[in-house]
């Protein structure tokens, strides 16, 4: 079996359907004895340019190991699903399991925000004890 990176973008009005779509696609992959190495739901993001007069889309990234038949089936499903506005399937040489740069950046922002919040509460507590 080969390794693939799959990214698909869902119409923002159909964001509530994304968990069900992910579930169906993962079931199709695992049902054919494939493996999912990484699954990331990036959520709603701004598009670089408008697609069908849309400026935002819901992004999902999957790194999988699956037979070609399943990948063909997924591509057909993407093509005929009106909620999927763009999709891309790329073959990769190796399984990618580490977090993507998108998720790493999000985690770093969260850590900085938490550190800042902790510093401000520590400063506020220090100010209260001095009085």
Swiss-Prot record:
Classification via SUPFAM superfamilies: Ribosomal protein S6
InterPro entries: Ribosomal_bS6, Ribosomal_bS6_CS, Ribosomal_bS6_sf, Ribosomal_S6_plastid/chlpt, Transl_elong_EF1B/ribsomal_bS6
Alphabetical list of Gene3D superfamilies matching this protein: 3.30.70.60
Xref: Pfam families: Ribosomal_S6
GO biological-process terms attached to the record: translation
Matching PROSITE patterns: RIBOSOMAL_S6
Cellular component, GO annotation: cytosolic small ribosomal subunit
Keywords attached to this entry: Acetylation, Ribonucleoprotein, Ribosomal protein, RNA-binding, rRNA-binding
Compositional bias (Basic and acidic residues): 104-116
A molecular function (GO) term: structural constituent of ribosome
N6-acetyllysine sites (modified residues): 93
Region (Disordered): 98-131
Superkingdom to which the source organism belongs: Bacteria
Regions of compositional bias (Acidic residues) in chain numbering: 120-131
NCBIfam families reported for this sequence: S6
PANTHER family with a match to the protein in the record: MITOCHONDRIAL 28S RIBOSOMAL PROTEIN S6 (PTHR21011), SMALL RIBOSOMAL SUBUNIT PROTEIN BS6M (PTHR21011:SF1)
Summary of the function given for this chain in its UniProt record: Binds together with bS18 to 16S ribosomal RNA.
Family under the similarity heading: Belongs to the bacterial ribosomal protein bS6 family.
Protein name: Small ribosomal subunit protein bS6
Species: Escherichia coli O17:K52:H18 (strain UMN026 / ExPEC)
